[in-house]
């Protein structure tokens, strides 16, 4: 690969990064994407001077970005000899033994999972990190990290008390949920909360009922827990497809007020009808995305003995936070708190203290109101570009959520389309891999968290231009 082509690809990928990010981070993401997706191992890069000129940055900025990629072992350098993309390790004289993984692990790894690419145009599930009030967050962090707060460096038992009280009040304001503080369990995010439910409330071989299409992360957690998964297609206009002869169901896992990945409002009536048909021992509702007015779509009842609610702050704030909560029936609060302590151990009290103060100060409410208005406008821009494309059956109505879903006509190969778009640096998820075998729906799931303003308008137009010929071909 010649020098000019490498420089051209660098500049092209750099231009696709969100302009709100620092120049160093944009360079890191551009080079990381090129190394992972496009360049072979052992490719010698142009000189630092040439790269800095191509990016239009100071050499020190480039050097910092390159140092980060060296730490990630994506680049290697020799003193005075240049910089190369890292070559694959040389094969050993004896072929390595294949990894001996459990059947559960193999099933998880064979299905859809977390993407290796967590930034870029339309990447699903990532909130707007650049606009988050990180300055206020850092100030709060500094204010709680003082010698008299040394206990915040220790283990926690069931979570930081003030954070549980803050969450209780937040749920009352935003979700019309009135629960006791003792019913709240602090978790390390949605996956951790779902895993705790799976371990505490079901045995290996028990059945969990899920909606189709489903959230891939929850399906992987249940698979890893050794549960039998029964996926039931759900359509907004018709409800759930009920099994003719339902067997015993330990858990019914349902999305909360806003369906993921379809990105449409759910129906408490549909969920109630499903639960009446299946009679699950417990109902776990995942309040993945929501706004202040859609709480009537929740089935959750804080006074019920079989309803649990899973929530997370990662989608509201930033993914690296990894803090969430469970609201559980009163009789389960003690046992599940103890089980969490035994299985996962608890800590991160500093993060919990900062989040509690962030909520008490009204900053989380203000952030949610602001960013949800913004997401609604962004979704409208994307919706307008997609709704008139050939082979498009429907586009989820603009909402204040991060995600948007476009459904294609039957027969369109959404997996191939997603792969083709990836080559154009457009990061989307195909819908069909998270549908049941009996659910023929195909489409794409995309996000609006990483793009805004003119960049969003430009990339939405580019997405349309790339999609149109692919859909005409049926790909």
Model region roles, listed by residue range:
Residues 1-142, 337, 341-348, 352, ...:
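N-terminal basic, amphipathic alpha-helical segments
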Residues 213-216, 432-436:
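Short, polar loop motifs at secondary-structure junctions
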Residues 330-335, 364-365, 411:
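Short helix-loop capping/hinge motifs at secondary-structure junctions, enriched
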Residues 80, 303-335, 350:
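Active-site PLP attachment segment
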Residues 281, 307, 392, 426:
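Short, conserved active-site loop motifs that form the nucleotide-linked donor/cofactor pocket
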Residues 150-280, 290-303, 375, 471-475:
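Conserved core of the PLP fold type I
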